[in-house]
Amino acid sequence: MTTNTVSRKVAWLRVVTLAVAAFIFNTTEFVPVGLLSDIAQSFHMQTAQVGIMLTIYAWVVALMSLPFMLMTSQVERRKLLICLFVVFIASHVLSFLSWSFTVLVISRIGVAFAHAIFWSITASLAIRMAPAGKRAQALSLIATGTALAMVLGLPLGRIVGQYFGWRMTFFAIGIGALITLLCLIKLLPLLPSEHSGSLKSLPLLFRRPALMSIYLLTVVVVTAHYTAYSYIEPFVQNIAGFSANFATALLLLLGGAGIIGSVIFGKLGNQYASALVSTAIALLLVCLALLLPAANSEIHLGVLSIFWGIAMMIIGLGMQVKVLALAPDATDVAMALFSGIFNIGIGAGALVGNQVSLHWSMSMIGYVGAVPAFAALIWSIIIFRRWPVTLEEQTQ
C-alpha cells in the first residue's frame, strides 16, 4: 500500500505521527539544557562540567549520522523506524536508572545513535507519505513538531524535572516514545528505501558549491547559537539572578517565538529565503551581543528571547529547505550530512560555552557567541551574492 492508494486522512495521520516523533527526538536532545543545574546537584558536580554531556551527544550524532545512514540504506524504513525507537526507549530507561554521571552519558549516547538515523530519513519519509501536492505542508508539519519541542517539550521537561526530579523527565520521554512507536506500527505501510544515496553520492554532493556553502554556514551559525543557549538556564539563575520559574518561562517564550518564525518563513520563504536567512542571522547576532546587558531586567530578557527564537527557527528552516532542494537525488545522504554538521555546531557551541563558563565567566557566553554569529552573517552575504539565483534552483 502506498500513499497514492490511501485516503488523505490516513496519509496526514502518518505525517502527523512522524511530526510527533520529531517532537520527541528534539525534546530529548534539548531538554538537558533546562536540567543542567538539577543533574549537577544530583551528581555533586559543577553545572559547566555536566554541560559536556551536550557536546558528547551532539558529536556522536555528527560522527554517526552518515555511517549509520549508509549502513541502513537498504533497510525497509518501517522496520528501521521500529528498531531505532526500541533503542531510543531502552536508552531512556537507562537514563532514568542511571546511578552515575558516566552511566547517564552512556544512555545519552544510545539516544544519539537513534537520533543519528532518525533525522537522516525523516524529511524524505514525510515527503513520500504526504497527500498529493502537499509535500511542503508535510515538511512544515515536521518543522512544527521541531518547534513545539522548544515551545512545550523543553519547558515541560524542565517543569517535570523541577517538581519530580530530572530522572522522571527522561522516563516520561520514554513513555511518549513508546506510545508513538505503537502508532507507527499501526499506521505505517512497508516503506522500501528510495533515493537514499550511497557513498557514490558523496563526491557528487561535494561538487555542489552552493550546498557546501550552506553546510559551512550551518555549522558556524549553530555554533554561535549554542555557545549561549546551552547555558541559558544557569545564566538566568546565576548571572541574571532570576528565579528557576523565570528560567522556565524564558525557555517557553524562546521556544514559542519559534512558531512565529515558522509562520514568517512559511509566508515569505519561497520568494525571499536568502534575505530571510541573512536577516535572521543579523538578528541572532544582535541578541547574543545584548544578552548580558539585557540580564538586568526580566522584561528585556523576555523581549530578547522572542527575537532570538524567531531568528533561530527561520535559520533552521532555511537551511533544511535549501539542502533538500539542492540534493533531490540523494536526500537521505544530504540530510544525514546536514544532521551531522548541525550537531557539530551544537557540540562546538556547547563546548565553547563550557570552556568560557569554566575558565572565564558564564556572563561572557553571549559576547563569545556573537563572534561566530558575525562570521556567519558575512558568509551568508557572500554566498547569496555569489549565487544570486535562489539556491533552491541551484542543482549543481
UniProtKB/Swiss-Prot annotation:
Residue ranges annotated as coiled coil are: none
Compartments annotated for it: namely: Cell inner membrane
Gene3D superfamilies per the record? MFS general substrate transporter like domains
Q: Name one GO cellular component term.
A: plasma membrane
Which N-terminal stretch is annotated as signal sequence?
none
Its membrane topology: Multi-pass membrane protein
Q: Report the family membership.
A: Belongs to the major facilitator superfamily. SotB (TC 2.A.1.2) family.
Q: What is this protein called?
A: Sugar efflux transporter
